[in-house]
């Protein structure tokens, strides 16, 4: 897998932005993780998984930074697609990032209903790359069932949208013709990803890595 070209999605840009924001706010991430990710399941093809612990005590700020990163990344998309994806995830683009989103409310309810004590299972949906390429999926364990739920929801949506090399390191970019071209490329590669998917029940179990 190391000899193949990396295949990036909007989720890669999102998680890079999220980690940068955590670092910029000097949030201590050395607190004991109350929640561990026990399993990661989904559809995998040419996908490598990395679990990173970034456990912290400030849940509100962490969710705010998560929403900020999401809004920042989908600014690459046309207005119609931005709003469709945001609505699917449960984030109101007209609200300030610090507002309690529908996503956060849903994840609070999810954690309460499932009574997660210390081990959490994540279903990330799809992680697929074309032949000759690989995808590196970085999952951040925030140490909170609610925040992990938020990341799980975001990865399911953003990890299906391919990022052409021309838009890497160019966030944000608002040229209309550029966005039209990006939208066309995203549609083409989304279809390509769908054509190569296959099912695998388990990708990661706590303490054990499985590569496909």
From Swiss-Prot:
Q: List the disulfide bonds.
A: 33-55, 47-127, 107-149
- What is any one of the record's Gene Ontology cellular component terms? membrane
Q: Which residues lie on this side of the membrane: Virion surface?
A: 1-175
For this protein, what post-translational modification is recorded in UniProt? Answer: Disulfid bonds are oxidized in the cytoplasm by OPG088 protein. Unglycosylated because produced in viral factories instead of the classic ER -Golgi route.
Note the topology in the membrane: Single-pass membrane protein
Indicate the principal place this protein occupies in or around the cell. Answer: virion
- Which loops or segments lie on the Intravirion side of the membrane, by the record? 197-212
Enumerate the subcellular locations listed in this protein's record, separating them with semicolons: Virion membrane
Q: What induces it?
A: Expressed in the late phase of the viral replicative cycle.
Query: What are the alphabetically sorted keywords of the record?
Result: Disulfide bond, Late protein, Membrane, Transmembrane, Transmembrane helix, Viral envelope protein, Virion
Instruction: List residues traversing the bilayer.
Output: 176-196
Q: Which InterPro entries match?
A: Virion_mem_poxvirus_L1
- What the protein does? Component of the entry fusion complex (EFC), which consists of 11 proteins. During cell infection, this complex mediates entry of the virion core into the host cytoplasm by a two-step mechanism consisting of lipid mixing of the viral and cellular membranes and subsequent pore formation.
Give the protein family: Belongs to the orthopoxvirus OPG053 family.
Subunit arrangement? Answer: Component of the entry fusion complex (EFC) composed of OPG053/F9, OPG076/O3, OPG086/G3, OPG094/G9, OPG095/L1, OPG099/L5, OPG107/H2, OPG143/A16, OPG104/J5, OPG147/A21 and OPG155/A28. Except for OPG095/L1 and OPG052/F9, each of the EFC proteins is required for assembly or stability of the complex.
What is this protein identified as? Answer: Entry-fusion complex associated protein OPG083
Originating gene: OPG053
């Amino acid at each position: 897998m190391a000899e193949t070209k990396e295949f990036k999605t909007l989720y890669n840009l999102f998680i890079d932005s999220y980690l940068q924001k955590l670092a910029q706010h000097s949030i201590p991430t050395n607190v004991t993780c109350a929640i561990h990710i026990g399993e990661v399941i989904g559809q995998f093809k040419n996908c490598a998984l990395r679990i990173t612990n970034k456990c912290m005590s400030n849940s509100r700020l962490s969710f705010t930074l998560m929403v900020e990163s999401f809004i920042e990344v989908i600014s690459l998309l046309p207005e119609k697609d931005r709003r469709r994806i945001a609505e699917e995830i449960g984030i109101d683009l007209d609200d300030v990032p610090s507002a309690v989103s529908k996503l956060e409310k849903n994840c609070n309810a999810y954690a309460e209903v499932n009574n997660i004590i210390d081990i959490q299972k994540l279903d990330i949906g799809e992680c697929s790359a074309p032949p000759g390429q690989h995808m590196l999926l970085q999952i951040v364990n925030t140490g909170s069932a609610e925040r992990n739920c938020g990341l799980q929801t975001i990865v399911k949506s953003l990890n299906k949208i391919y990022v052409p090399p021309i838009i890497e390191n160019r966030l944000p970019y608002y040229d209309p013709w550029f966005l039209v071209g990006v939208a066309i490329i995203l549609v083409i590669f989304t279809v390509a990803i769908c054509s190569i998917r296959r099912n695998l029940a388990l990708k990661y179990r706590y303490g054990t890595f499985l590569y496909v």
